[in-house]
Regions:
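Terminal, regulation- and interaction-focused segments at domain boundaries
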Residues: 1-20, 66
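Amphipathic alpha-helical hairpins
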Residues: 2-8, 41-43, 74
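Short histidine-centered catalytic/ligand-binding loop motif
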Residues: 6-7, 64-72, 116-120
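Ser/Thr-rich, low-complexity intrinsically disordered terminal regions
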Residues: 20, 24-48, 52-63, 67-68
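Long, contiguous binding/interaction regions
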Residues: 98, 109-110, 116, 122-135, ...
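Short, aliphatic-rich beta-strand segments
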Residues: 104-108
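Short, highly charged C-terminal tails/helix-capping segments
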Residues: 142-166
């Protein structure tokens, strides 16, 4: 790769946009490599580890928003049913249960073919969408994992929106 190609590649790397967003919001972040950046965001229920990865080979910016909840093996079948029920409600992104770690995460990707660049608005929308979905459904995961509730019970509780704060 020539020096010029390296400069063009670094300008088109959407992680620079994500890094600017994190810095402007005073969110702690870490670049673990030239193609990965992780932000820590405090939520109402838990802290979120939000990893953005630039996947040059498929020209996509991948987001994975994980929270600290390890799913016990005995509860995984019900959690998988809950993930399916939640994903039916989502228009953008999806939740996954990573079976090898037992972790839940919200994932989505922004495809940027042919050298397109990500805008600040696109990256902010990805970030906001992941946090919103995680905040909305975190209690449902808690109900299933720690309270032993069914998917139906957890979804009923998650779909109940309250007004204001107590």
């Amino acid at each position: 790769m020539s020096l010029l190609e390296g400069i063009i590649d670094s300008r088109n790397n959407p992680l620079a946009v994500v890094e600017d967003i994190a810095a402007s919001n005073n969110w702690p972040f870490e670049r673990s490599g030239e193609d990965e950046l992780t932000i820590v965001s405090k939520g109402q229920w838990t802290d979120y580890q939000i990893s953005f990865t630039w996947m040059g080979e498929i020209e996509a910016l991948h987001l994975a928003c994980a929270f600290d909840m390890k799913i016990p093996v005995a509860r995984r079948p019900e959690v998988q049913r809950l993930v399916a029920a939640i994903n039916e409600q989502l228009w953008v992104g999806h939740f996954d249960l990573w079976t090898h770690t037992g972790m839940i995460m919200h994932r989505q990707a922004l495809v940027l073919p042919g050298g397109l660049t990500a805008s600040t608005a696109q990256c902010e929308a990805m970030l906001a969408g992941a946090i919103h979905a995680s905040e909305r459904y975190f209690p449902a995961f808690q109900f299933v994992v720690w309270a032993g509730k069914s998917t139906t019970e957890a979804m009923s509780a998650a779909m109940f929106d309250t007004e204001g704060e107590a």
